[in-house]
Curated annotation (Swiss-Prot):
Name of the gene encoding the protein in the UniProt record: aroK
Pfam family, one: SKI
Residues that, per the record, bind ATP: 14-19, 120, 156
The protein's name: Shikimate kinase
InterPro entries to which the protein is assigned, alphabetical: P-loop_NTPase (IPR027417), Shikimate/glucono_kinase (IPR031322), Shikimate_kinase/TSH1 (IPR000623), Shikimate_kinase_CS (IPR023000)
Protein's cellular compartments: Cytoplasm
Tagged with keyword ATP-binding: yes
Keyword terms, alphabetized: Amino-acid biosynthesis, Aromatic amino acid biosynthesis, ATP-binding, Cytoplasm, Kinase, Magnesium, Metal-binding, Nucleotide-binding, Transferase
Pathway connected to this protein: Metabolic intermediate biosynthesis; chorismate biosynthesis; chorismate from D-erythrose 4-phosphate and phosphoenolpyruvate: step 5/7
Length: 171
């Protein structure tokens, strides 16, 4: 690979962005970053606590700053937070600074993959499946808008999805 290019993974929670991103980075010998983990590292607090203290708007402002910093690097794979694309500036940066891959998954798979995860503040309520449906209705068009490639993650291993991405991108 002559030129180091960035690959940015977008998609809903439970799509496998972090797991697939690590495999992708390993295969391509790129650095891997997860925007949520980077926010936690910089603040010393977990995402749920930031949501509780600052609300979603405060969290999104932090997320935008972190994504701006990370997308300025070269030769990385970045797993973004599921809601990062709601911010127009984030969508613009992702599009301008790398290849954007939308990892698509069904609501059923999201429920199965996230049901025991207490670190997802938006799902800590009576009906997480309905929350996921509502989020999908709002966010899926934004994922599609920003995506250079769309890859379904439902019935494949993370490594198989990573290899499919490499093949689609032509790396």
């Amino acid at each position: 690979m002559a030129e180091k290019r960035n690959i940015f993974l977008v998609g809903p929670m439970g799509a496998g962005k972090s797991t697939i991103g690590r495999h992708l980075a390993d295969e391509l010998h790129l650095d891997f970053f997860d925007s949520d983990q980077e926010i936690e590292r910089r603040t010393g607090a977990d995402i749920a606590w930031i949501f509780d203290l600052e609300g979603e708007d405060g969290f999104r402002a932090r997320e935008e700053n972190v994504i701006n910093d990370l997308t300025d690097k070269q030769g990385i794979v970045l797993a973004t937070g599921g809601g990062s694309i709601v911010t127009k500036a984030v969508r613009n940066r992702l599009s301008a600074r790398g290849i954007v891959v939308y990892l698509q998954t069904t609501i059923d798979k999201q429920v199965a993959r996230t049901q025991r995860d207490k670190r997802r503040p938006l799902l800590q309520n009576e009906d997480p499946e309905q929350v996921l449906r509502d989020l999908a209705e709002m966010r899926n068009p934004l994922y599609e808008e920003v995506a250079d490639y769309i890859v379904d993650t439902d019935d494949q291993s993370a490594r198989a999805v990573a290899n499919q991405i490499i093949s689609k991108i032509g790396l």
